[in-house]
């Protein structure tokens, strides 16, 4: 019996078990053995991928950059969600704060999410530095390191930032675009109470990562099976809704450029080392 393709994923939410049971069953029902291993944090998952204990890792952008750099660029991004493309960070403030641009943050308190979150901390800090240069010293940075190891997947630190803004403990803060859309669509804050004043350029988020050494047939089989999923099939539709995508897409050179800004930021902030 052939060995299964072993995929790693971080269990940031109980729904992850359901998502991966559906994917595993889909593969197995179609004649391809697949199993998954759940991790409590991305640092452990990176270690297992680099040491060959798993074949493929469902990685955040931070985990991808670390894997790529620590493998001496001998890793490959295979596949991603359509929603991982053109992801953005948003700066939020109270509507009546008088803050209309990043320049208005001088002398203010600005909140960042978990230190290992690309969308809520790593990239926002870089954007602040780009916009303010030396004047960043005039901004009081407040960090909310909730759920470290999950790379911002839970979104908890972003809601900590929002609550602090609501309760006047912060003047402004950074969150990911998906959290901001959720706030607006679900009416999580009174209408007109908070607003955005800065939206970053688009960048890429998660991807399925494999080392170059993984058999090409295994890579192709995995990608082909994922792409063959029919989003109109009820069980697949359920999985995709839970995972937050409309379709899987192959990661090309164009998408890889969407990790350049994060790679630069992580190097500048000394975040490449994998501290597990």
Which residues fall in each region the model found?
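Extracytoplasmic/secreted proteins, especially bacterial periplasmic and envelope-associated proteins
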Residues: 18, 22, 44, 123, ...
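Pocket-lining segment of extracytoplasmic ligand-binding domains
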Residues: 111, 119-215
């Amino acid at each position: 019996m052939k060995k299964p393709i072993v995929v790693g994923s971080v269990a940031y939410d109980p729904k992850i078990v359901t998502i991966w049971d559906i994917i595993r069953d889909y593969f197995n029902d179609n004649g391809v053995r697949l199993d998954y291993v759940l991790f409590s944090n991305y640092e452990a998952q990176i270690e297992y991928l680099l040491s060959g204990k798993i074949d493929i890792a469902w990685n955040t952008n931070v985990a991808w950059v670390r894997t790529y750099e620590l493998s001496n660029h001998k890793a490959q991004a295979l596949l991603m969600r359509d929603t991982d493309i053109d992801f953005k960070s948003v700066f939020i403030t109270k509507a009546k704060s008088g803050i209309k641009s990043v320049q208005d943050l001088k002398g203010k308190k600005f909140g960042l999410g978990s230190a290992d979150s690309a969308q809520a901390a790593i990239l926002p800090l870089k954007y602040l530095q780009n916009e303010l240069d030396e004047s960043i010293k005039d901004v009081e940075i407040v960090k909310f390191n909730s759920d470290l190891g999950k790379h911002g997947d839970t979104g908890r630190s972003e809601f900590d930032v929002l609550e602090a803004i609501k309760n006047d403990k912060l003047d402004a803060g950074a969150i990911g675009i998906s959290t901001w859309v959720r706030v607006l669509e679900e009416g999580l804050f009174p209408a007109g109470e908070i607003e955005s004043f800065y939206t970053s350029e688009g960048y890429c988020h998660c991807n399925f990562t494999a080392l170059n050494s993984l058999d090409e047939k295994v890579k192709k089989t995995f990608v082909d099976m994922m792409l063959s999923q029919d989003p109109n099939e009820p069980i697949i539709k359920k999985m995709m809704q839970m995972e937050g995508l409309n379709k899987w897409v192959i990661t090309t050179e164009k998408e890889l450029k969407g990790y350049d800004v994060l790679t630069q930021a992580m190097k500048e902030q000394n975040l490449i080392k994998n501290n597990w």
